[in-house]
Amino acid sequence: MLNLVRLFAVVDDIFCLFQGHIENVALLKQQYGLNKTANEVIIVIEAYRTLRDRGPYPADQVVRDIQGKFAFILYDSSSKNAFLASVSNKNVLYSS
């Protein structure tokens, strides 16, 4: 049985609880300009923040480039948006 990591982080009033594993961590770190110590939860926050700051994108855009087995819930307290994704059933829920 695969042991899935559970991580929590807060960056600039964006809260994220992540469980699982991302397979393409190195590629995503490069894509988002993150340092070598960035983990899965930081990658999710940065993907969300990058897309949020670029304009209105569909919520599922955040998870399109992420490969692996994971689920996360993200809350952006500045915009009061919540975002839940689960790769196991390909669902992305977004609440604003």
Where do the PLM segments sit?
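N-terminus-centric sequence/structural signature that marks the extreme N-terminus
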Residues: 1-96
